């Protein structure tokens, strides 16, 4: 079982933990992924000035562990930019604020109330629960998800401005399904 630990870094809150987090998970042999603080799920009082960008995190890590080397993407739609230390330890960076990846996103999410969201930031969900209630089988669900995915036009991260974004909170499971 491959384990990856995701951690969100927020300026003036936990950025002082970047080195200890890296050290701890390096010692455990567990990959860590640093996530830029995002305005996801209607996060209240999100402020872009609180974002610690991936480049900044890499600079901090380099002061203790040496220069990081970028790694090639393993598969299309991979959300983490992977880097390695000179000893081969891999660190991931999910940089949806500074380096949006909307065009290559392959992630969909299903909420607790059975709605499919084609973007983590989306306020608009598609009702899959009703399909199931009406007797849809797995092929029907698959076809519905594929059709919804093909017509998606979500580009929230690419279109985000530096102004605070007003959204309605959506309770979304962070377990994702991969749409192919």
Predicted regions and their residues:
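Conserved C-terminal portion of the radical SAM core fold
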Residues: 1-44, 58-66
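Proline- and acidic/polar-enriched loop/turn elements at helix boundaries
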Residues: 7-8, 37, 72-74, 161
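Short, mixed-charge, low-aromatic patches
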Residues: 12-19, 100-104, 163
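Conserved small/polar residues in nucleotide/adenosyl-binding loops
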Residues: 175-180
């Amino acid at each position: 079982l491959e384990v990856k630990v995701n951690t969100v870094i927020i300026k003036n809150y936990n950025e002082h933990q970047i080195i200890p987090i890296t050290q701890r998970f390096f010692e455990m042999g567990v990959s860590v992924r640093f996530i830029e603080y995002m305005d996801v799920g209607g996060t209240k009082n999100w402020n872009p000035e609180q974002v610690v960008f991936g480049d900044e995190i890499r600079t901090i890590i380099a002061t203790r562990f040496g220069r990081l080397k970028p790694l090639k993407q393993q598969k299309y739609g991979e959300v983490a930019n992977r880097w390695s230390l000179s000893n081969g330890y891999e660190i991931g960076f999910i940089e949806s604020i500074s380096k949006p990846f909307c065009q290559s996103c392959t992630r969909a999410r299903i909420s607790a109330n059975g709605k499919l969201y084609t973007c983590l930031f989306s306020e608009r969900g598609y009702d899959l629960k009703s399909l199931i209630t009406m007797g849809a089988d797995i092929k029907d669900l698959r076809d519905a998800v594929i059709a919804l995915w093909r017509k998606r036009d979500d580009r929230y991260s690419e279109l985000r401005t530096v102004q605070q974004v007003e959204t309605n909170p959506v309770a979304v499971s962070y377990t994702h399904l991969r749409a192919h």
